[in-house]
Amino acid sequence: MINFEKVIPNKKQIKELYHLLTNRRYSISHQNLPSFEEHSKFVSKNPYLVWYLIYKNFELLGSTYIQKDNSVGIDLKLPNKEDVIEISSYIKKNHLPLKPVKSLRRGDFFVNISPFDKELIEIFKKLNQKEIQRSFLI
């Protein structure tokens, strides 16, 4: 069973989130690893609607968050179908997406995944989740 710890944030959580960041295999939002101080400032701003550290059997499994555009970030050390199902279910059971705003925000939760994260992409395909978008830098 997975346990979700809401990011407050405190020193322990900032360290664990930095550990996850330094070991992340794929990234969407940054090219270079921030310093611990930069990371600490970012986390302290509490930039997401909600952010959780995820534990399984008292071991840090990853993190998940919801942004103001209803996107859900999922960062797992070793993604697997069962954990993704449990995380998705927890998000949907405990949170409602923000109302849609035409041309700005969908009325549903959605997950952005790095195109290099083949494991997570395959998990969502096996779960018959609909792909709605591909993004390109210009």
Question: Where are these predicted regions, by residue range?
Answer:
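Conserved beta-hairpin
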Residues: L49-G62, Q67
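Conserved acetyl-CoA binding element of GNAT-fold acetyltransferases
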Residues: Q67-I87, N112-S114, R134
